[in-house]
Amino acid sequence: MSHVPTAGTVPYPQTAAVVLAGGLSSRLGQDKARLRLPAQDGHSLLERTRQLALHFVPHCWTSCRSARQRDCEADVLVDFMPGCGPAGGIYTALTRAAGQGFRDILVLPCDLPFLDEITLQRLFLTHATAPPQTLLTAYAAAESGRMEALVGIYAVTALPFFAKALQEGQRAVRDIIPARHQNLIFYTSADSRPFLNLNTPEDLHTVKSLLASCR
């Protein structure tokens, strides 16, 4: 049964979202998804990201590696193929989205404390005017060309590429969608703050310092 709402409820009713929160957070030493940072209204990183996504789309899942990981939270998607990392989470979300009548999914990681509405709005507007063969609209660093594959909009028609990649043991998300099906938005180092993520205690210190300077 389709869960796509009536047009006008949200800006992009044919898109669902998934927040990837299945990582071990081993380098950080604590569950980054549950981390609460100063000057962010007391929300965890996961909840902040979910709320941000729901400004644009009608439904947002949380992708986890096991049911126990998020046993107190709603809208959890447990990976169909455990041990595949973010690629497995995206594959699961694409499968669920296709089954519920959505056209695209917005993919976001849970550990970007500076991700904002402006960045997501640009992503959606660019995707809306992308060439018809586009399966992925994502950001990429202008200096290095490195794609932010976990901040992107994937068409549900990208599902066969993920299925094939996982069957073949391919786990690197940025290598799954061929370049001819990508639509990239390039950003400079001066505009890179929305993509600053949390992996280590040093990253956490940097983020807290930046948040303090913004007060």
Residue ranges and their predicted role:
Residues 3-170, 178-194, 201-214:
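Nucleotide and nucleotide-moiety/phosphate-recognizing core
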